[in-house]
C-alpha cells in the first residue's frame, strides 16, 4: 500500500512539474512581441482596427493564438503565428496579460 501511495505521489509531482513548466514567461514574451507591436501597439493597447491585447486573460490569448496558428479565421494571423512554439504562445500570453 505504501508503495502505491509513493508511486501516486511521484506521478502527481511530475504532472504538476509539467504544468509549472508550461506557464508563460512574461519577459520572454516581451522579447517576442515586436512583431505584434506593428498592429497591436508597443504596449498591446491596440491600433484600430486591431484589438487591444493588454490585460486580457492569458488563457484567452493562448486559445486565440493557437486558433490562429491552426488557420482559424485570419490568414494574416495564421502567417504570423505559424512559427510560434507552444512555449512562445504561453510567453506572449503571459506578457500581454501582465500589461494594464
Predicted segments with their positions:
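Regular, well-ordered alpha-helical segments
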Residues: 38-41, 63-66, 70
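Generic N-terminal leader/processing signal
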Residues: 1-2, 28, 54
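N-terminal export/targeting leaders of redox proteins
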Residues: 1-23, 100
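The canonical Cys-X-X-Cys-His
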Residues: 34-42, 92
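ATP/adenylate-binding site constellation spanning eukaryotic-like Ser/Thr protein kinases
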Residues: 58
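Axial heme c-ligation environment in periplasmic c-type cytochrome domains
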Residues: 47-54, 66-100
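Electrostatic cytochrome c docking/interface patches
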Residues: 14-33, 47, 62, 67
